[in-house]
């Protein structure tokens, strides 16, 4: 079952990550996921060209995927509405600034015309969903050992997206606006 983080869990998770010697390096990525509602493949595909700091939005028009047969490849959003501009909250803006400041040069890899990916693994190659799935699983295990309120049983990058959508809906965001931002499916009553 898809269970979002509670506001308390969200805050405690970020505090934990910020102060943990292993997971501090993932802090900005998790902040960005929680603040934008991006799919993990959309996050993985981001390059500096996708960030508009002046107007404070993230341009989403592609996603980075990887298969064992084909290696890395870029895919456009599945539908026309998948192309969107996602606002940067103050927290997301600051996280992106830190990411760019700390960014190291990776291998000169170009995938279907895209290069300079923001999030690289230790080998200097672009991260993909599988990197984050493993990280979230280990993060939840370590977090749950020292917190009374455990994280959901299934903890994945999609949990961050679900948390974003739930937080926005609870804050009273117009369902159509939320649908645009994160491309969630809203069932009519």
Predicted features, each with a name:
Residues 1-46, 54, 81-83, 91, ...:
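Basic, Lys/Arg- and aromatic-enriched nucleic-acid-binding interface segment
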Residues 15-26, 36, 86, 102-117, ...:
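Short, basic (Lys/Arg/His-rich) helix/loop patches that form interaction surfaces
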Residues 45-104:
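Conserved tyrosine-mediated DNA breakage-rejoining catalytic core shared by Y-recombinases
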Residues 8-11, 41, 49, 130, ...:
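Residues in well-ordered alpha-helical elements
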Residues 6, 14, 61, 89, ...:
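Residue-level detector of conserved, well-ordered beta-strand and adjacent loop positions
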Residues 184-189:
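Conserved small/polar residues in nucleotide/adenosyl-binding loops
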Residues 5-12, 59, 131-138:
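Generic alpha-helical secondary structure signal
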